[in-house]
């Protein structure tokens, strides 16, 4: 009788133990352990406890002990990989542990957009979205030897960057990032665009320089090919381009208004003083501006000025007298607007 009782007790104990082990296995390996999606950023200096805290705060861990067990089992503390990880609500504890140990990252969107007129702006935009710091990016942008491997210099490196959204891993190194931009540059400059540049008797770099001037003149994309046509007309005629954005560049974009006295600044970038194109882009031109130069409107316009409607558009003219008429109309509108503003104070 006693033997039977002990046997039953042993069976129950084994069954209980098996159930306990199976329960833990199910909890750690099969059962989702997060209540919502979370983006987890793991920095190189982070400890496993900091990662756990970040998980708990962002993904709302349902069973913290399951995380503790699986992290210990997978030796996450010593094997964790920096990265950007997407934690889905359906993720199990063991999956997240493996994700961190094997570095199963989700690519990050890196977006370059808006007006980019300095290397510092490039560095800040990249570092704000990636793990690399702005100092490292800025150093690369000014490193002659580093840029030479991509065919660029610290002076013309603006041309390398084509504003868009690209996917890459958050932990990408400086070289990884520049490799990607060079790859995208080579893809963009396909046979068709190269042929169009050649037809204009311009190199891809010269096209980018011209595009940067267009980019500095207007925010209206429909005007890109029109303004490009104006500057190409001047260029072909051997005229000075007389582009205000190049003067702004000479003063590091610190001028509120470009006055007559600023037009005499002695710089190879000053197109009021020197004929031809500046030696390098004056900003990072977007793809639309580049294509605007490659596909310019065919017209006879030589001049243009801001519209008196103050809507960001321009009025164009073939002759100088027509241009003066447009300029005077704009000046009258500007004076009237300034008076109205002053009266309203």
What residue spans do the PLM features occupy?
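Intrinsic structural disorder
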Residues: 1-9, 37, 41-44, 53-59, ...
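N-terminal type II signal-anchor transmembrane helix
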Residues: 1-36
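Generic structural signal for short, solvent-exposed loop/turn connectors between secondary structure elements
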Residues: 1-3, 105-106, 114, 254
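Short low-complexity stretches enriched in small and charged residues
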Residues: 6-9, 37-42, 78-80, 119-121, ...
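N-terminal start-of-chain detector that recognizes signal peptides
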Residues: 10-15, 58-59, 82-84, 136-141, ...
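Signal peptide-directed extracytoplasmic domains
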Residues: 23-188
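Bacterial extracytoplasmic/cell-wall-associated proteins, especially those involved in peptidoglycan
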Residues: 47, 128-135, 147-345
């Amino acid at each position: 009788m006693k033997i039977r009782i002990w046997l039953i007790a042993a069976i129950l104990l084994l069954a209980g133990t098996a159930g306990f082990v199976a329960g833990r296995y199910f909890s750690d390996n099969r059962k989702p352990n997060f209540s919502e999606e979370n983006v987890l950023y793991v920095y190189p200096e982070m400890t496993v406890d900091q990662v756990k805290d970040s998980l708990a705060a962002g993904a709302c861990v349902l069973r913290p002990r399951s995380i503790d067990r699986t992290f210990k089992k997978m030796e996450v503390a010593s094997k964790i990989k920096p990265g950007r990880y997407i934690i889905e609500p359906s993720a199990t504890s063991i999956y997240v542990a493996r994700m961190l140990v094997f570095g199963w990252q989700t690519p990050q969107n890196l977006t370059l957009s808006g007006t980019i007129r300095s290397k510092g702006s490039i560095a800040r935009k990249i570092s704000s979205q990636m793990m690399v710091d702005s100092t490292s990016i800025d150093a690369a942008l000014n490193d002659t030897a580093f840029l030479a491997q991509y065919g660029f210099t610290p002076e013309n490196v603006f041309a390398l960057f084509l504003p868009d959204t690209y996917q890459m891993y958050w932990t990408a190194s400086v070289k990884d990032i520049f490799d990607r931009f060079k790859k995208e540059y080579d893809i963009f400059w396909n046979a068709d665009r190269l042929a169009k540049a050649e037809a204009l008797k311009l190199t891809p770099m010269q096209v980018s320089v011209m595009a940067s001037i267009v980019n500095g003149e207007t925010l209206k994309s429909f005007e890109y090919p029109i303004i490009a046509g104006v500057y190409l007309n001047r260029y072909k005629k051997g005229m000075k381009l007389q582009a205000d954005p190049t003067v702004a560049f000479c003063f590091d974009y610190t001028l509120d208004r470009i006055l007559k006295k600023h037009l005499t600044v002695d710089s190879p970038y000053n197109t009021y003083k020197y004929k031809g194109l500046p030696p390098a882009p004056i900003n990072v031109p977007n793809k639309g501006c580049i294509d605007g130069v490659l596909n310019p409107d065919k017209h006879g316009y030589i001049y243009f000025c801001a519209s008196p409607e103050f809507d960001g558009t321009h009025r164009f003219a073939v002759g100088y007298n027509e241009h003066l008429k447009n300029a005077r109309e704009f000046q009258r509108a500007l004076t009237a607007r300034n008076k109205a503003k002053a009266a309203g104070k």
